[in-house]
Amino acid sequence: MLMPKKNRIAIYELLFKEGVMVAKKDVHMPKHPELADKNVPNLHVMKAMQSLKSRGYVKEQFAWRHFYWYLTNEGIQYLRDYLHLPPEIVPATLRRSRPETGRPRPKGPEGERPARFTRGEADRDTYRRSAVPPGADKKAEAGAGSATEFQFRGGFGRGRGQPPQ
């Protein structure tokens, strides 16, 4: 599809920076939400990504009316060459997440945190303890119950059925 080079470059830059691209399956959407400041239509994003997919530079997933594209290693190399980027710059999906360097958490008595029950856990534990009294036989209680005589009465309106005996 013919599209302005500035739109293609804006799409490729965002894809390389994030490592992923998401687009709603709507060809009539006037602007892609992440590229609204550059005035890029959603159709251009979909077609540029379709082109990259056909060359094997992105993997495509589709769910709930949204396309999800993930860069492959070949796609990273292609975009690096196309956008003239140095090898030190990598997409956000390949960067290591640094552990949080917040303040140290205070320790409780004996260096451990006290055990806390939320409402759901406490209810669940009491239910499990009181469900079967100690010494009761679960297998004797399982089964059809107290009804010892069964009656089978035809098949829910299919056919005439048998007369009662």
From Swiss-Prot:
There is a cross-link at residues 138-139 (Glycyl lysine isopeptide (Lys-Gly) (interchain with G-Cter in ubiquitin)). The modification Phosphotyrosine is found at residue 12. The modification Omega-N-methylarginine is found at residue 153. Residues 90-165 are annotated as: Disordered. One of its GO terms (cellular component) is postsynapse. Methylated by PRMT5. Methylation is necessary for its interaction with NPS1, its localization in the granular component (GC) region of the nucleolus, for the proper assembly of ribosomes, protein synthesis and optimal cell proliferation. Its main location: cytoplasm. It is found in: Cytoplasm; Nucleus, Nucleolus. InterPro entries: Plectin_eS10_N, Ribosomal_eS10, WH-like_DNA-bd_sf. The modification Symmetric dimethylarginine is found at residues 158, 160. It comes from the Eukaryota. Residues 154-165 have a biased composition (Gly residues). Residues 97-128 have a biased composition (Basic and acidic residues). Keywords: Cytoplasm, Isopeptide bond, Methylation, Nucleus, Phosphoprotein, Ribonucleoprotein, Ribosomal protein, Ubl conjugation. The modification Phosphoserine is found at residue 146. GO terms for biological process: cytoplasmic translation; ribosomal small subunit assembly; translation at postsynapse; translation at presynapse. The keyword Nucleus applies. GO terms for molecular function: structural constituent of ribosome; tRNA binding. Belongs to the eukaryotic ribosomal protein eS10 family. Component of the 40S ribosomal subunit. The ribosome is a large ribonucleoprotein complex responsible for the synthesis of proteins in the cell. Component of the small ribosomal subunit. The methylated form interacts with NPM1. This is Small ribosomal subunit protein eS10. It comes from Mus musculus (Mouse). The lineage of its organism: Eukaryota, Metazoa, Chordata, Craniata, Vertebrata. The gene is Rps10.
